[in-house]
């Protein structure tokens, strides 16, 4: 739990002809989630993100999932990134960097985060089958990379996600989401040794 007297909460919403998204993200939460995107497996992943990041996360989304889940997932990432950026504020007192290795059965994933204000994404190591696998009839695993990249760009963080090895598309996806959750949790935690913004430039 952060020592901030006021919880760091970001709220954002976005409505287009393809989707309608509302997000509330509390960085100083306890892992409570309220997720409803119309894509059950994506709900499962966002629930894991909140729970393992110890974030209170509310995501309500409606999109054209009867056509494809891609619009809903990518638009949700946009709004989540905006909410995360708002919650981070001036970033004073945070650790800034975080990383995590997460195993899931035969899979091992790693994520590293720099809350730098310089958005960048690198995703490597997913096996070729992730380009064509579909989970639950709606979630195409090729969307993983789009989600993480869009989240990073809109929250203005540098995010690196690696699948070191794995076979099952479900396990690979879940390990990646949990690794991002843990890395982000570490990066946004209060650092009692840092009184201001964790940068030699004085700003992030």
From Swiss-Prot:
InterPro entries: IGPD_sf, ImidazoleglycerolP_deHydtase, ImidazoleglycerP_deHydtase_CS, Ribosomal_Su5_D2-typ_SF. It comes from the Bacteria. It comes from Corynebacterium jeikeium (strain K411). GO terms for molecular function: imidazoleglycerol-phosphate dehydratase activity. GO terms for cellular component: cytoplasm. The keyword Lyase applies. It catalyses: D-erythro-1-(imidazol-4-yl)glycerol 3-phosphate = 3-(imidazol-4-yl)-2-oxopropyl phosphate + H2O. SUPFAM superfamilies: Ribosomal protein S5 domain 2-like. Belongs to the imidazoleglycerol-phosphate dehydratase family. This is Imidazoleglycerol-phosphate dehydratase.
């Amino acid at each position: 739990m952060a020592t901030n007297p006021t919880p760091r909460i970001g709220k954002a919403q976005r409505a287009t002809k393809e989707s309608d998204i509302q997000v509330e993200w509390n960085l100083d939460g306890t892992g409570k989630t309220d997720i409803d995107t119309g894509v059950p497996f994506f709900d499962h992943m966002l629930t894991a993100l909140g729970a393992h990041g110890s974030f209170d996360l509310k995501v309500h989304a409606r999109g054209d999932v009867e056509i494809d889940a891609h619009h809903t997932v990518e638009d949700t990432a946009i709004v989540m990134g905006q909410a995360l950026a708002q919650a981070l504020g001036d970033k004073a007192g945070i650790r800034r960097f975080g990383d995590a290795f997460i195993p899931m059965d035969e899979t091992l994933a790693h994520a590293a985060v720099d809350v730098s204000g310089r958005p960048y994404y690198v995703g490597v190591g997913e096996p070729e089958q992730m380009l064509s696998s579909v989970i639950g009839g709606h979630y195409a695993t090729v969307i993983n990379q789009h989600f993480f990249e869009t989240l990073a760009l809109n929250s203005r963080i540098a995010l690196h996600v690696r699948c070191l090895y794995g076979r099952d598309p479900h396990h690979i996806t879940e390990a990646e989401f949990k690794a991002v959750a843990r890395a982000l949790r570490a990066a946004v935690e209060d650092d009692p040794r840092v009184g201001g913004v964790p940068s030699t430039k004085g700003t992030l």
